[in-house]
Amino acid sequence: MVNVPKTRRTFCKKCGKHQPHKVTQYKKGKDSLYAQGRRRYDRKQSGYGGQTKPIFRKKAKTTKKIVLRLECVEPNCRSKRMLAIKRCKHFELGGDKKRKGQVIQF
């Protein structure tokens, strides 16, 4: 279980100094229907002849690498950058911090 705080003080390239950053998890955007590869694929698929390209079935990994999106909280900066961290099964953003010697309650 990886628990990352929602804010982090780190270097901002635009400001040129350490600033607090808002941390969110990166999500992939929706694929464009008009990208060259997509247009080519749709053209090839149309008409008779079934599936024209191989469908990938050999999945090797069980996890994805976590990518954090850091946004500077300075009002006139707001620059964003990505930061990749290691692979993990469970990822949590801004969860409760673990305490030493604390009694677990259910």
UniProtKB/Swiss-Prot annotation:
Region of interest called Disordered, as start-end residue ranges on this chain: 26-53
Modified residues (N6-methyllysine): K53
GO molecular function per UniProt: structural constituent of ribosome
GO biological process, one term: translation
Annotated compartments: Cytoplasm
Keyword Ribosomal protein: yes
Keyword vocabulary terms for this entry: Cytoplasm, Methylation, Ribonucleoprotein, Ribosomal protein
UniProt entry tagged with the keyword Ribonucleoprotein: yes
UniProt cross-references to InterPro entries, sorted A to Z: Ribosomal_eL44, Ribosomal_LSU_eL42, Ribosomal_zn-bd
GO cellular component: cytosol; cytosolic large ribosomal subunit; endoplasmic reticulum; nucleus; plasma membrane
Main subcellular localisation: cytoplasm
Any Pfam family hit: Ribosomal_L44
Annotated tissue distribution: Ubiquitously expressed.
Origin: domain of life: Eukaryota
Protein family (similarity comment): Belongs to the eukaryotic ribosomal protein eL42 family.
PANTHER family: 60S RIBOSOMAL PROTEIN L36A/L44
Additional notes on this entry: This gene has no introns in its coding regions, and therefore, was most likely produced by retrotransposition of the original X-linked gene during evolution.
UniProt-recorded name of the protein: Ribosomal protein eL42-like
Source organism per UniProt: Homo sapiens (Human)
